[in-house]
Amino acid sequence: MYQEISQLLMYGDLDEDSILAQMGEVFGKYETGEYNKTGLVRDINTQVKRILKVATDYGFDDNLWHNYLTFFLMMSENPFSMTCEKVGASDGSVNELVENDFRIFKDLFDYDFGPIEKDLGINCFSQISNYKAIHKKDLMYNKNVSEKVRSLSKKLEAAKDEKEFFDAVTGFYKDYGVGMFGLNKAFRIDDTPQGSFTFRAINNMDTVMLDDLVGYEIQKKKLVDNTEAFVQGKKANNVLLFGDSGTGKSTSIKAIVNQYYKDGLRMIEIYKHQFKYLSEIIAEIKNRNYRFIIYMDCLLYTSDAAD
């Protein structure tokens, strides 16, 4: 496994502390025979526990090793995956390089953990390769991501070669995108101690759809027409929703995002004190192949407001 991972090119820029990189180090020791058995088992257990943590957060099931590798491919923002974002793969020499990477990933999918389990007297890889997750309520994990990971994982398991693997992964990039913006519908801004910001996905946003909103037909039509123009790259307007609390303003936005997520619509929610980041936020997202709603709620200005 160490040799396979070390030969990755487009997908080879690994964080040294990532699960995949650490698994490569573990198997490098095993494959050379330069290891202490107790220490190696401890290292393996550490990485398996990390896989279980990711599996719990995102509701993985069945083969957690396959689910993790699939999640890694979905989240990997590299020059190739970014060019495939919402458009799919184009013809070019880079495809051959990527197919080489996908041949390695197929080998990782099909990796036989039997020898290392036998030599070390462990069975953790067998356990996570045939895993039955505890049923969890939707709010306890990211269901939206879980469904996508498990679906693509099954397609990659069935891939006969690197070309089918390539088609499945790039098909996902075309349908949804790549990285956190591809997998998630909506985001908040978190302030950092360094005076900057990070994007944080909003997990399990209400699944309300426009048809669930009774009444407001004229308002809904205006929202739909404006949103459809926006996602199609046509001229669209900024929108101000106003009304008493509980009249459906926030719910309408959630419904719009749910309805047009597959068309590349995403939402970023920012608060009044975060307006100072607005130009930086736009700079971060302007080259991504999505359409972003910048959602500003509770803009409460009073006559004595200093700002």
Regions found by a protein language model. Name each.
Residues 1-154:
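Intrinsically disordered, low-complexity N-terminal extensions of AAA+/P-loop NTPases
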Residues 139-198:
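Interdomain "pre-motor" coupling segment immediately N-terminal to P-loop NTPase/helicase cores
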Residues 208-227:
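N-terminal pre-Walker A segment at the start of P-loop NTPase domains
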Residues 229-236:
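Phosphate-binding P-loop
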Residues 239-265:
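Walker A/P-loop
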Residues 259-289:
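AAA+/P-loop NTPase substrate/partner-engagement loops
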Residues 297-298:
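Walker B catalytic acidic pair
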Residues 301-307:
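Conserved small/polar residues in nucleotide/adenosyl-binding loops
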